[in-house]
Amino acid sequence: MFTDAIVRGLDGDDPSTPSANANQPNDTVHTIAVFGHRPPELGGYGENSTTMSVRRRLIELLRAKLEMHPDLQVITGLGLGVELLAAEAAAAAAVPYVVVLAFEGMEQRWPEATQRRFSELLAGARSVITANAEVPKTSSQFARAMGRRDDTIMTYTTEAVLVRHADDRTLGDLQRKLERNLEEDVWVMNPE
């Protein structure tokens, strides 16, 4: 099982340099957090035109941001949906990414193919941070663990991308929190 900050997947990363160690706050790295919908709001759990479009647009955005910020990195929770797409887009755009897990083993209830995809993306991360030491046992503990994970992500974030339908209410609180913390550096992308 992977533990905090031991997985480094990019050639040339030097753990002693600040940009390669996401466990230390670092003002010199431009970090984009990516949040968004889970699979049901993206057309389902399999690959489809919506997930392909979101991934493609994230790749284009990251390539453009990389030209503006050569020290760019992505930070993601690697949850189902947009967060997995964000890691895939970062890898495709040759942008390093950091993973903040809500807790160890969060993928264990997922289908086997998705667990393999998760493991591959986790292995490719610049570093991995685990926000909660304990695995939640109840739905309220799970919600708190996810909230702590989001708060951990935000401590490293320079700007954010939120993939959501404009009329969706589930991500409204997160959008307001991001806008409060990052002001105008929050980009909302419609998944369609």
Show the residue positions of the predicted features.
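Acidic/glycine-enriched connector segments
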Residues: 4-192
